[in-house]
Amino acid sequence: MVRVMATGVFDLLHPGHIYFLNEARRLGDELVVVVARDSTAKRFKHQPITPEQSRVEMVSALKPVDRAVLGNEGDIFAILDTIRPDVIALGFDQAHDEARVRDECRRRGLPTRIVRLPRFEGDLDGTRKIIRRVGEYLAMEESLAKVEGRRGEEPSGRAG
């Protein structure tokens, strides 16, 4: 059985995440996803909007995922000793140095294959894009409210 490991923050799930996990799942028989701790996400990317426990629960519920676990605090490579993957799937935009990941696997006696997956070509394929789009939407609604004389209402009078 080929065990694939994929990692990520998975904050504000979007089509790019689903594509990444589907592609990772195709590389083997079992997909184990390591969800970054809040502290790790903050150190390497950004403060997550969604708490770590909620993120791991959401990822666990996704069809291609066999198991989702929270990563380790501090040493992000320590999880390799527990999961012992045959393949590590890296997203196109993940900053992990493939040579360093390979070295960490070798150091642990793991003959793990590292695969860099292609980019998802679609709209809203990143958390920052979603946040930016929401910001643009809210700014537009605020401008419309000022023009129309609305204040303190839900955008365009819609219930939230």
Where are these regions (language model features)?
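Nucleotidyltransferase catalytic core that binds NTPs
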Residues: 1-160
